[in-house]
């Protein structure tokens, strides 16, 4: 039994999807709240958090019960275990950070997809199949179809080699990390600099040329709208930290103004 990834279906239909990044709140209930709020998916960040895989496992189970896909950003791209283990516990996909070379991309496909596309290790009767493997070949094919594999484009080498990177079969999305990209271009903190925006526009064009979904992380509605108008379709919107902090600040200010 394989979870049907409604986020991936929406993207195939040409829709825009939105989802926040979680890196602080360790609660399965967060998945239900995001589903109730209407988000299409959410990220769990292992690159910049202290989450254990056991913590992530509980959050993923809750997300599947609430029918909201989870995309895990692993802590590293450098070995199979960083990619395959989040998928084995039921993540609907991966956002693989710090991609720079074609070899990086080929490794991602090998470690995240089953044969014949990749060479992911076989352990089908796990959380990702609700502990029932079914027919082996059918299950492998279904998992390959439902998993979304996104490359995080956040280094100048990735920008320069992007057409080669996206030509590797098995990649669904090219997702820009604006902060790291700006730093890689020598202008840290200046995500609105023309050089950064030119690089991001390049990602959109090359992704579309290769039938790959372009995506980006944004911190505001205005910024999200700006990039949607330019062609972005997979939108990462804020973080759990920023969403909570914003509503708390707004509430406190409103309460104080009532005094």
Language model segments and positions:
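N-terminal amphipathic alpha-helix/helix-capping segment at the start of soluble metabolic enzymes
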Residues: 1-21, 133-145, 201-202, 208-209, ...
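Active-site mouth loops of central-metabolism enzymes
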Residues: 11-28, 71-76, 147-160, 213-218
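Glycine-rich, proline-tolerant flexible connector loops at the mouths of alpha/beta enzymes
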Residues: 30-31, 35-58, 176-194
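Glycine-rich phosphate-binding active-site loops on the catalytic face of alpha/beta enzymes
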Residues: 93-104, 120, 174-183, 232-251
């Amino acid at each position: 039994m394989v979870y049907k990834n409604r986020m991936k279906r929406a993207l195939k239909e040409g829709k825009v999807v939105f989802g926040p990044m979680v890196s602080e709140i360790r609660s399965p209930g967060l998945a239900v709240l995001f589903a109730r709020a209407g988000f299409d998916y959410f990220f769990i960040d292992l690159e910049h958090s202290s989450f254990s895989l056991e913590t992530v496992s509980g959050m993923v189970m809750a997300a599947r019960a609430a029918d909201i896909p989870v995309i895990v950003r692993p802590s590293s791209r450098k070995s199979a275990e960083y990619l395959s283990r989040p998928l084995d516990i039921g993540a609907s996909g991966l956002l693989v950070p710090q991609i720079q070379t074609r070899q990086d991309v080929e490794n991602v496909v090998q470690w995240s997809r089953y044969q014949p596309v990749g060479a992911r290790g076989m352990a089908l009767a796990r959380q990702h199949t609700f502990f029932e493997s079914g027919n082996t070949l059918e299950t492998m094919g279904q998992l390959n179809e439902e998993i979304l594999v996104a490359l995080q484009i956040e280094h100048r080498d990735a920008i320069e080699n992007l057409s080669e990177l996206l030509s590797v079969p098995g990649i669904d999305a090219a997702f820009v990390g604006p902060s790291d990209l700006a730093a890689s271009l020598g202008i840290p903190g200046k995500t609105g600099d023309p050089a950064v925006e030119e690089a991001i526009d390049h990602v959109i064009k090359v992704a579309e040329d290769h039938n790959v979904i372009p995506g980006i992380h944004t911190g505001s509605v205005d910024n999200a709208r700006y990039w949607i108008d330019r062609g972005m379709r997979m939108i990462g919107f804020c973080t759990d930290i920023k969403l909570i902090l914003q509503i708390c600040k707004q509430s406190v200010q409103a309460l104080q103004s009532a005094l």
